[in-house]
A protein has these predicted regions:
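Bacterial N-terminal signal peptides
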Residues: 5-14
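N-terminal secretory signal peptides that target proteins for export/translocation
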Residues: 1-2
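Short, flexible, surface-exposed loop segments at domain boundaries
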Residues: 16-77, 82-416
Length: 416
């Protein structure tokens, strides 16, 4: 009887420990976005080649300028959006305020950014308060204000403007585009002569709105809840106000926003065609003499026209990659050592894929499978019709003699 009691006790204890174990993404799987921690902050540092950087995270305290830069790393399948379109980290200007959904490091031993205690977001950091340095620093979704609002169905409604010498303050609230019962929070946002104002195909200045009589040359004016989209940054402010954000861009109508989205979409399409589509190996069926059939899932967040280039019967090239999405080799171009083959199948999942996955699975056969094509590994693939170009040195792994090349360490990040 005693051994059954002890067995039950150990089972209960095991279940308790399991229940308290914090969630971490698993290799070869796309994590549920619902389990991510959400925060926002200003982009203050970028290491684009290693897909990492630092944010000044907005916490519970009121002294934003004191918040130390908080390192983050993009997961291999992370979705980055800027101006409502797919983006690479290099596309986003420093100072941009970004919305984040992130997880704990999948494997702390291989983290490219500092690993923090799992409860770090709850710790008080002096006058900065809590939340400024969350341990959830491996990012699934990174998006600017305009992208966030479009995804969530939100708009900024401008209440009034107070202006002097082409700079001043706008009182605005972020609300559901279609209305609702929730009471929006009003926010004071600064602007100045450098703020870009977009209307249709025009790029205007504050002085242009003043000249047209839409804004006063000096003083206050009601804007009657005008619905717009905003680009938001942060900059130091006078008068002892430590947490106040700044308008970098103001899109007055849908046409202007759509044009910004189109420009960024084309920028990213050209980037992916030159760097290849990132994907995850699902399965490999090995044949004889180096032959293999590879099944893989293309990563999500790209423009649909890129996925449309993967057609059954078409030729593809596949090259190994690291979790930073660096090509495994590139001294003679990524195509030099790539596996080449024919697409046997291209299928689309019937259900909505998790964030990070396109839901598009490809299967191709190659007569020379490379080491990087193993189940659970990240790789890059391109249709043969995409341009064959060389990638810059910082975007591919060398001869393997330098471990930092494959596995960047957090050593570059200063401790504050």
């Amino acid at each position: 009887m005693m051994k059954y009691v002890l067995g039950s006790l150990f089972l209960v204890l095991g279940l308790c420990v399991s229940a308290e174990e914090p969630f971490r993404p698993e290799a070869g799987k796309f994590p549920a976005v619902e389990k991510a921690h959400t925060y926002r902050g200003e982009l203050v540092f970028v290491d684009h080649a290693n897909r990492r950087g630092s944010l000044r995270v907005q916490g519970a305290g009121g002294t934003y300028f004191r918040n130390a830069p908080h390192p983050f790393a993009l997961l291999p399948y992370a979705v980055v959006r800027y101006h409502g379109a797919p983006a690479d980290l290099r596309d986003i200007p420093l100072g941009t305020v970004l919305h984040v959904k992130a997880f704990l490091p999948p494997d702390p031993k291989l983290s490219a950014v500092p690993v923090l205690p799992v409860d770090n977001k709850d710790k008080i950091a002096g006058y900065s308060g809590t939340g400024v340095a969350p341990a959830e620093n491996h990012v699934l979704l990174l998006e600017d204000e305009a992208s966030h609002c479009q995804r969530e169905g939100l708009v900024w409604k401008l209440k009034d403007v107070d202006i002097k010498n082409n700079e001043g303050m706008i009182v605005a609230s972020c609300e559901p585009k279609d209305g609702g019962n929730a009471k929006p929070t009003t926010e004071n946002l600064t602007f100045d002569a450098a703020t870009r104002i977009w209307r249709g195909r025009e790029c205007l200045s504050v002085a242009d709105l003043v000249a047209e009589g839409l804004w006063p040359a000096s003083g206050k004016k009601s804007l009657d809840g005008q619905a717009v989209q905003l680009g938001i940054t942060w900059r130091p402010t006078p008068d002892g106000i430590f947490t106040r954000f700044h308008i970098s861009d103001l899109w007055l109508d849908d046409s202007a926003m759509q044009r910004a989205t189109l420009v960024q979409t084309e920028t990213h399409k050209a980037f992916i065609r030159s760097r290849w589509m990132p994907a995850l190996v699902d399965n490999v069926e090995y044949g004889k003499f180096g032959r293999a059939t590879v099944t893989a899932t293309l990563f999500g967040g790209m423009d649909t026209s890129l996925y449309a280039d993967f057609q059954k019967g078409g030729q593809v090239l596949a090259n190994g990659a690291e979790n930073t999405l660096k090509h495994a080799g590139g001294a003679y171009g990524p195509a030099h050592m790539a596996s080449k083959g024919t697409l046997l199948n291209v299928t689309k999942a019937a259900v909505e894929p998790p964030l990070g996955s396109s839901g598009i699975q490809i299967q191709f056969e190659t007569d020379l499978v490379i080491e990087g094509l193993r189940p659970g590994r990240v790789f890059r693939v391109r249709p043969a019709g995409w341009p064959q170009v060389q990638v810059p040195r910082e975007e591919y792994v060398g001869d393997g003699s330098n471990a930092e090349d494959r596995f960047p360490t957090p050593i570059i990040f200063p401790k504050y």
